[in-house]
Each structure stands twice: as structure tokens, then as C-alpha cells.
């Protein structure tokens, strides 16, 4: 099921499983996972997109390998919280995951996650070239941590 309400998402997620997070891009997807206590997000990897079938297959494989029970996907909303054109594509992708794998997915506003990731990497001394190669997985980590913070204040 696709969730936009953190209360509903919290009720639907297995308590002893990790949560996987995706920061969707046209060419690549940043991936992060929570720990099993669902308190801490950790950047995992960047997946370079191929086609829908391969993308879904790869994401499902690492979802299972990392003992995940639910998923968060970043949604790029405008400043006034209206959806961007890219949101429609992300929602369609999320619905394909749900239909194929029966996973609960929460859509988290991803506003400024890439800017925060880039800035964080810059102040740690990582070069712009290297930063561009890893900022999507850091963005996924930021998006997931926002969700974890939300659901842990509800618990």
C-alpha cells in the first residue's frame, strides 16, 4: 500500500525489519537502509538504472538481502508542497513495486535532501567530483532519517 501519512505507515511496517529508502533519479537511484530498530539510517549504494524490469528486480533483491519489511521513497515536492512533474513518475514506479512485491511504501518529502547531502560532503572535505558520485545515497539516507524521526516521535 502507498502511504502519505506517517501514522498509517507506522501501523503497516514490521517492527523487526529494516526500512529501505530510495532517492529516485532518471539515471540512478540512491539507496539507504535503517537498522533493525528503525532508529538510524545508513547510506547503502547507488544503483545505475537500466530498464524497468532490471531496476525492479535489483531493488527487490537487495530489499530481501537486507531483511527489509517496508520502503520509503523520496518525493520531490515544490516549496508550496505541490507535486512536481517528476512526482507522477515516482508514484507510478512506487505502484509498480507495490503491485509486483506487495510492499508498504511511504512517500517522504525530499526537499533540500540533495543540497544538504552536497553541503555535508563539501564541509567534510570531499571533492565536488567525488561528491557527485555519492550524494544520491547520502540524500536517500537523509530522506530515510527524516521518516525515522517522524515515526519514532509517533511511537
From Swiss-Prot:
Is Electron transport among the key words of this record? no
GO BP: rRNA 5'-end processing
For this protein, the record's SUPFAM superfamilies field holds:
Ribonuclease H-like
- Which EC numbers does the record give? 3.1.-.-
Q: What is its main location?
A: cytoplasm
Protein keywords = Cytoplasm, Hydrolase, Nuclease, Ribosome biogenesis
Which GO molecular function entries does the Swiss-Prot or TrEMBL record give?
nuclease activity
Q: Which Gene3D superfamilies match?
A: YqgF/RNase H-like domain
- Cite the InterPro entries for this sequence: RNaseH-like_sf, YqgF, YqgF/RNaseH-like_dom, YqgF/RNaseH-like_dom_sf
Q: Does the keyword rRNA processing apply?
A: no
Q: Name one GO cellular component term.
A: cytosol
The record's subcellular location field reads: Cytoplasm
The job of this chain, per UniProt, is described as: Could be a nuclease involved in processing of the 5'-end of pre-16S rRNA.
**What is the similarity comment for this entry?**
Belongs to the YqgF nuclease family.
Q: Which protein are we looking at?
A: Putative pre-16S rRNA nuclease
Task: Give the organism the record lists.
Answer: Wolbachia pipientis wMel
Amino acid at each position: 500500500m502507498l502511504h502519505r501519512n506517517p501514522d498509517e505507515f507506522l501501523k503497516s511496517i514490521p517492527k523487526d525489519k529494516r526500512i529501505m529508502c530510495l532517492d529516485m533519479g532518471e539515471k540512478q537511484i540512491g539507496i539507504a537502509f535503517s537498522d533493525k530498530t528503525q532508529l538510524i539510517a545508513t547510506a547503502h549504494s547507488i544503483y545505475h538504472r537500466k530498464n524497468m524490469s532490471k531496476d525492479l528486480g535489483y531493488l527487490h533483491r537487495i530489499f530481501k538481502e537486507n531483511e527489509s519489511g517496508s520502503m520509503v521513497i523520496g518525493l520531490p515536492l515544490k516549496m508550496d508542497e505541490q507535486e512536481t512533474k517528476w512526482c507522477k513518475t515516482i508514484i507510478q514506479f512506487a505502484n509498480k513495486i507495490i503491485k509486483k512485491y506487495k510492499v508498504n511504501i511511504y512517500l517522504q518529502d525530499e526537499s533540500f535532501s540533495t543540497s544538504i547531502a552536497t553541503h555535508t560532503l563539501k564541509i567534510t572535505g570531499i571533492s565536488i567530483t567525488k561528491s557527485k558520485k555519492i550524494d544520491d545515497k547520502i540524500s536517500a539516507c537523509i530522506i530515510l532519517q527524516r521518516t525515522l524521526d517522524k515515526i519514532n516521535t509517533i511511537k
